[in-house]
């Protein structure tokens, strides 16, 4: 406020306030945006849902609103997102047609089975069984590291084992078993949630001579 600036949440809140209190403007925008499609609907919060209702119109029969999302991927609760808006959408638009897509074109069945074992523990699980035609014999390993640096060293160790070592020290110290392993560095990807989590990995890769 001191800088006379608005962030994203402010823009949504201002838009909601304006549309809720200016009927002629609301009517013009509803006429302009006759079809509304929302992706990643599981990330919607109260202000965003209110904005959708104002734009689409609260006449359920006249609204042309399509929402796409997965309630089992709702991870933004810390900023107000609520998977409960799937239920509210059904209540506010009872004539809406629900289409459930259960086939995954991204992941193998091994990955999907592991994910569903975790998600199924939630009392809010949607009970949608995802399946894939991608077969895989590779198992999912779970490693709980005591610190972020220990985690980075574990990642380095796994890569070294699968490429056959990155130095003579790797061989002499017994960190690798087979120096003739067929993997290359280009076969690996390390995924992390936040950019801040990359620093221990960068340092561990640099120490071990792993290009990235």
Role assignments for model-derived ranges:
Residues 1-88, 100-107:
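Conserved helicase NTPase motor core
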Residues 55-59, 93, 205:
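Active-site catalytic pocket residues across diverse enzymes, especially alpha/beta-hydrolases
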Residues 94-97, 102-211:
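Helicase P-loop NTPase motor core
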